């Protein structure tokens, strides 16, 4: 059997905060993006484009056939909540579960454009600086 493996697997993943509470501020958004990057490194997932909004996260990813996206999402959500909680305990709480849809390679640019346009689509959900120090 050959050692050659080729694959083109892409997905759009989303998850949101508990009860869609807009608890992700600008500092927390940095922590969430960092957590997603850490989860990618640990699981072998690659992010093409992402958007972190006040109440949900949108990464467009590529992954190997032996990768379970549930492991990536679980790790990203867990690490993000832990990092944000280091600053202010209990500020970000994720809802259970996530949504994922696979993307054909020909639709990849459309999916990444959709994610890139999230701030225009939801200007009210752009993570803002906290108004009160230490509070999200």
Regions found by a protein language model. Give the residues of each.
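Basic nucleic-acid-binding interfaces
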Residues: 1-136
């Amino acid at each position: 059997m050959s050692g050659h493996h080729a694959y083109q697997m892409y997905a759009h993943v989303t998850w949101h905060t508990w009860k869609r509470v807009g608890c992700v501020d600008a500092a927390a958004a940095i922590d969430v993006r960092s957590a997603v990057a850490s989860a990618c490194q640990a699981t072998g997932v690659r992010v093409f484009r992402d958007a972190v909004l006040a109440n949900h996260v949108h990464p467009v990813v590529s992954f190997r056939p032996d990768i379970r996206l549930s492991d990536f999402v679980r790790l990203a959500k867990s690490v993000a909540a832990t990092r944000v909680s280091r600053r202010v305990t209990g500020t970000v709480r994720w809802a259970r579960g996530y949504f994922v849809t696979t993307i054909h390679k020909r639709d990849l640019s459309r999916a990444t454009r959709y994610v890139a346009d999230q701030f225009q689509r939801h200007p009210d959900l752009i993570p803002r600086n906290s108004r009160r120090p230490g509070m999200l």
